[in-house]
Amino acid sequence: MSSDAPERFDPETGIAAEVETARIEREMEQSYIDYAMSVIAGRALPDARDGLKPVHRRILYAMHQSGISARSAHRKSSSIVGETMGDYHPHGDSAIYNALARMAQDFSMRNPLVDGQGNFGSVDGDPPAAMRYTEARMSPIAEELLDNIEMDTVEFTANYDDRLSEPAVLPAAFPNLLVNGSSGIAVGMSTNIPPHNLGEVIDATIHLIHHPECTVEDLMNHVQGPDFPTGANIVGQNAIYKAYKTGRGRVRVRAEFDVQDDRIVITELPFQTNKARLVERIADNVNAGTIEGIRDLRDESDRDGIRVVVELKRGANPDIVKNQLLEHHLESTFGVINLALVDGQPQVLTLKETLHEYLEHRRTVVRRRSQYELDEKRDRAHILEGRLRALEQVDDVVDIIRNSTDRDNAKAALRGEHVVESDERGESLPTFDFSEDQANHIVAMQLGSLTSLESDEIEDEYESVQERIERLQTILNNPDELDAVVEDELATIRDKYADERRTRIIEDDGTVTHEDLIAQEDVVVVVTEDDYIKRMSLEDFRSQHRGGKGIIGTSLKDGDTVSSVYVANTHDYLLYFTSHGQVYQLKTYQIPEMSRTARGKSAVNLLELDDGEQITAVVNTAEMDIDDDEERYFTMVTQSGYIKRTSVNSFQNIRSTGIIAISLGADDKLIDVEVTDGNRDIILGTRKGMAIRFNEGDVRSVGRSARGVHGIKLEDTDAVAALAAVDDDQDDWVLTVTEHGYGKRTDIDRYRQQSRNGKGLIDIKTNERNGHVCEVETVGISDELFMMSRKGQILRTPVDDISTVGRNTMGVIVMDLEDTDTVASVDTHPRTDDSSEADSGDGESESENATATTPS
C-alpha cells in the first residue's frame, strides 16, 4: 500500500480510522441488489448468445484447454472438475460435477454436450456415480460451440485470480439456448426454457436471415414447438404460440401410451418426470382408491426404452382408466419462461428475439473471425512479397548476406539501414528497403528455397493468399455476403447433426393448430429419384412462352435426377404412391420450404419409405372435393399396362408406415394415379407414342391388394408413360409431351373410344428429335403447364401457347433443353392472375413442322 494512502484502521486499537454513516435500509437494499445481480449474471441465467451459464461454459472451456475433445480418450470426471475449479470456477466441486453430469444426460439435454462413460444418472432419479468413477469428454456437437475460439471471435476476461483468461461467451455455431434449453432460479426471477429440435431451430434462423421482418407466426412454420429428449406429446398449439409470442406460457405435456383391451402401455414420459416416482404414485393412488380398474403395475423398462405396463381388471373400461391416469400422473405442465441475459441484463425474449440475439452474435463472430484471418493473410502476403522480391534479385541478396559480418548486420543491410560497399569481387551492391519481418524471413531462408520450384510454390501461395484476402474483404464489406457465410455454416451444422422430432404435437379442443398458422398459398413441389423433396412458392416461377429454357428449380447431388413436379396448396393433403405399390399421406406444408437452388430434404424423414422405394405418383385430395353421396375412385396404371380402380373409401386410414395400394408383378411398377368418378373416359399413353381411350366402367372396382386388368396391349419394348382422365366439362385437348421437350395439343374428339386392352392409336411421333413420351394430360384453355427437366430446370408456360394439331404429328418445341437433359415431369394447374401474360423467354416461332402425316 502507498505510504500516503489513508489508514483504514487504527494500528493500535484495530478500530476504523474513518467511520461513514449510512442508512441500514439503503445499505441492505444496495447490498442485496449487488448480490442479486451477481447471482443473475454470474450463476443462474444463461447468456442469450451461447445458451450457457458460466459453470457450463467454464467446464467446456477447461476441457477444450486440456485437449479433451470428442476425438480424445475419456478423462476422469474428477480431473475435469478439478481443472475447472482450480482455473476458472472457484466454487464447490459437487456443483461443478452436477453441471457436468447434466450435460451428459441424454434425457436432460436434447443434444448432449458431454460424452459420458459410466453412470451419469437415470430417468428414475438415480444420482450419478462419484466423480472418481465416471469419465467424460466433449461430444462432437459441443466442439461446434468452441469452434474458432482461438481466432479472436469472442471477448475474453480475466479469471478469478487474474492468472488466466476465459471467454465471456462461446462462438456457438448453433443456437444452443433453444436447442438444449435451460433452467435456473436467480434472485427474484427464474428461467425455464424448453429444448427444441436442432434442424427446426436452424431452419427458423435461416428464415430470419432472409426475412428480418418476419413474425412469430412465420417462424412457427419452421419451429413446431419444444422437442423434449424424452419425446411424449404436447397438447395444443395455442400455448406454444403464446409462449413464443410473449416469452412466457404454460405447455401441457402428455405421456405417450398405447391403450389396449386389457392394458395400457406407457412408452414415453413428460420431460423431467421421475419414472420410479411416477410408478410409485400410481400404485399409491390405486391402493387409495383414487384410480380404479388397475390390477397390476410393472416397470419393464430397459436400455432400449421406457415401458411401464398397467394391467387392467376384467371389465374395466380402458378409456376411463386412461383419463384417470392423465388427470393424476401422465400429463404435466411445462412453464415456459424464456429469460436470458442480453448485454448482461436479464430479459424475457420472444422466439424471434431469441433468434435475433443469436444471429447478431454469429454475425459478430464471423466478422471478427474474418478480420482476424484477414490480418493473418495480409501479414503472410507481406512476407511472401518480400521473399518474391528476394528471389528476383537472389544473387545480390546472397552477396549482401555473405558479405555481412553477422545476421543482424545482414538484416540491417536488407532493410537499407547501411550499405554493403562491395563484395569480394569489388563490385558495388544495391540497397534494399525490406521491412523488418521480411528481412528476418529472408535471412532465415534455406538454400533449398532458392530453387525455381520453390519460387513457383511461393508465387502460387501468394496468389492463393491474395484470393483469400479478396474474399475476406468481400465478407467484411458486404452484409449479404457475411449473412451467406452464417447461413452456410448453420446449414452445415443442420446437415451434420439434425435428427427427427421426438415430441409430437397433438391437437386439443379450442386450440390454435399448427395448420392455422400457415398461410394458404400455391406451391411447387419437387421430388427427385433419390427421394429428396421440397416445396417452393409458385410466385418464384414467372410464366414464359413455350420454347423457353425455364429457370433453375432445384440443386441435385451427384447421380440424382428429378422424378416429378406438381403444384398444390399448402393446406392440401397429398397421397404419395410409390414404386412398391404403397401409398402414404402428408400435408403439403409438412414438406420443407426451400429456395430454388436448395437440394431438398430426404423424403425418408417425412415418409417411412423402404430401401429402394421411390415416389412415382402424387394425388392431391383437393381433387376429391365432392358431395357425400358421390363415389370417387383411384384409377391406377402400371408401366406394363395393368389398370385398376379402387374406391377412395378404402384409403381413409393411411398409417404412417403406409398401406398397400396395388399389387405389382415382377419388374413392374406403379406409374400414374388419377381420381375418377366412375363415368370418366381413360386415356393411356405409352412411351412409344401410342394412346388408347376407353371408359373407366370397363375396369371394375376392386380392393386395394388387387393387381387389376390389362388396359393396353404393348409392344415388347414399349411401356405405359402416363394416365389421363377426361373431364367433359373442363377438358378440351389431350396434351402430349416428349422427353426431348416437344409437345402438342390435340382435340380430345380425335381419340375415339375403344375397348380396353386394345393396341390404341398413334398419338405422337417418337423419333430421334422428340424422344419417348413422358407425359399425357387432359387440359383446358385456362390451364398452364409446369415442366421440369432431369437436371432441375422448371418452365411455366400457358397451355394455349402450344399448337393444336392432329394425333400422328411431330409437335412443337415446348422447353429448350441442354443436349444431355430430358423432361422428367409435367403437371398442369389452373392459370393464376400473375401468369396471365407470359414472358417472352426464349420461345421459338410457330413455324416449326407442327403437322405431319394425317392421323389414322
UniProtKB/Swiss-Prot annotation:
Residue window of motif GyrA-box: 544-550
Reactions this protein catalyses: ATP-dependent breakage, passage and rejoining of double-stranded DNA
Keywords per UniProt: ATP-binding, Cytoplasm, DNA-binding, Isomerase, Nucleotide-binding, Topoisomerase
Annotated S-S bridges: none
The enzyme's E.C. designation: 5.6.2.2
InterPro entries in alphabetical order: GyrA, GyrA/parC_rep, Gyrase/topoIV_suA_C, Topo_IIA-like_dom_sf, Topo_IIA_A/C_ab, Topo_IIA_A_a_sf, Topo_IIA_dom_A, Type_II_DNA_Topoisomerases
Molecular functions (GO terms): ATP binding; DNA binding; DNA topoisomerase type II (double strand cut, ATP-hydrolyzing) activity
Region (Disordered): 822-856
One GO location term (cellular component): chromosome
Pfam families: DNA_gyraseA_C (PF03989), DNA_topoisoIV (PF00521)
Gene Ontology terms describing biological process: DNA topological change; DNA-templated DNA replication
EC top class named in words: isomerase
Active site: Y133 (o-(5'-phospho-dna)-tyrosine intermediate)
Topo IIA-type catalytic domain span: 45-517
Localization of this protein: Cytoplasm
Cited function: A type II topoisomerase that negatively supercoils closed circular double-stranded (ds) DNA in an ATP-dependent manner to modulate DNA topology and maintain chromosomes in an underwound state. Negative supercoiling favors strand separation, and DNA replication, transcription, recombination and repair, all of which involve strand separation. Also able to catalyze the interconversion of other topological isomers of dsDNA rings, including catenanes and knotted rings. Type II topoisomerases break and join 2 DNA strands simultaneously in an ATP-dependent manner.
Additional facts recorded: Few gyrases are as efficient as E.coli at forming negative supercoils. Not all organisms have 2 type II topoisomerases; in organisms with a single type II topoisomerase this enzyme also has to decatenate newly replicated chromosomes.
Protein family (similarity comment): Belongs to the type II topoisomerase GyrA/ParC subunit family.
Name under which the protein is recorded: DNA gyrase subunit A
Organism whose genome encodes this protein: Haloquadratum walsbyi (strain DSM 16790 / HBSQ001)
Lineage of the species this protein comes from: Archaea, Methanobacteriati, Methanobacteriota, Stenosarchaea group, Halobacteria
Gene: gyrA
